[in-house]
Amino acid sequence: MNSQKDQSARYCLNNDRGMEVEIASKGGSIERLIVPDRNGHPENIMFDCSLVTVPAIPRGLSGRLYDTSSGSVHEIDLALHQLLFTAEPFSTIQESGLRLSAEISVNGQVIAIDMLYVLTNNNQLILRYAATTNQPLRLSLSLPVFFNLSGNLKASITKHDLKFSSSCFIHPVPALSINPCLQQTKGTPFDFRLGRRLNRFFLDKMFSRSPADTYYLFHQQPVISVHEAVSGRWMTMETSQPGFVLSTAAHHTDTFFSGICFDSTDFLLSSLINGPIPSFHETTYSFSTTY
């Protein structure tokens, strides 16, 4: 296992099984994610969301502060995707990794952010988020990544099979509210408990636009499974967060089939950081193939 830095402040993590992850110290974005297919051919399984212009999707870490003192919700975007982090690469026999850290001040609130990226020889990419503050506040941290398991964008995501256990959802994710309205997935196109192919989801007549930005609350196991049959790639995502936002994106405004994102995040405004006590959560992506 090793990690390398290039002149553009990008760091490459790789393992002994052909996986590579390229990370930028500016914004903490994952620039490339190389995963071999069932025949051992390495390909990039990421969709570059920076190519999307309408609506614009920032590439990199997302951080937001929420103020509810007035009875309504006020959101402050920390613009972490534009922040230059201090980077510390490391490696062991079993894994390679990168630690990104930064401290920012917003209206007298000092926030220390520590982000850890770990690639293991078991083909797991682990993202660990930590933050401390000088006073209690509501803060969300996440790293949206858009996937296309066909590899090098050879095909759309319509033939991806998706499965996860969720009995409640919010669609679309509303303007911020303290008490959002949850709906039951049972009997709706949003029910993925038994697994569904994405083209059936996208073609449902209830969608007049992209079925993006749907929040799902996990039921029982916080695990998502995705399979692409042609390449044989499997991806599972497991997180310590209670739910995630499902989003889709594409190069062109007339379709939304190029990439899919599972942005693990707390249930809207339920997260509260208590000063010097670190807020911590973790998301793990595991990759394998079928023959």
PLM region spans:
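Surface-exposed acidic/polar loop and edge beta-strand patches at domain peripheries
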Residues: M1-Y291
